[in-house]
């Protein structure tokens, strides 16, 4: 599936890609070399000594990112029909506004409405304000008086773009941490926005028993596209 993600990123105009490796790191690196890195500038962030989770992986890879452009993060286990170019352009435009000292955004999270247990919470301007587990009733937010019933609830799609400025804030976190934990702290002082894609079709193929379903899902995407 890494080939599909790389090709989708390339079509979106991305020319530098950082790949986090842990399981089967050698095989992944060999595969990239055999394909001449698909003609792109592909750099490896080595996590073979231990998985750093979704936030720690970004922190470790920080020196490998281009220093002056929004960083597009894509979970390799996620299959979707999202237009990555459109999504990244939206993030880039908002970054440009921030540079010009206008209303800007520090991170953009791809979200959609779908049934799940865990939701991100947004205000009416789609600014991130918290997180909730609707099964347990747990709420996490930097705003103590937050009422989830007054918020917009959307599920995170595992694809997001963040400003390089936010990387400095990650120094406050341990080597291993989840990206949602980071955003929930950052949203108290930074503008973290949700990008709603109502027509989003998405599948998480992180488990072996989803491979057959993944083939059907990819075929469906080919037909609809």
Enumerate the language-model features and the residues they cover.
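Residues at the starts of beta-strands that form the adenosine-phosphate
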Residues: 15-17, 41, 104-107, 191
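A generic "binding-loop/recognition-motif" signal
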Residues: 24, 48, 115-116, 198-201
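Conserved beta-strand termini and adjacent loop/short-helix elements that scaffold enzyme active sites
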Residues: 45-47, 110, 195-197
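Catalytic-core segments of class I nucleotidyltransferases/pyrophosphorylases
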Residues: 69-72, 79-80, 85-100, 127-225
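Short beta-strand-to-loop element that shapes/binds the nucleotide-sugar donor at the catalytic cleft/hinge
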Residues: 107-125
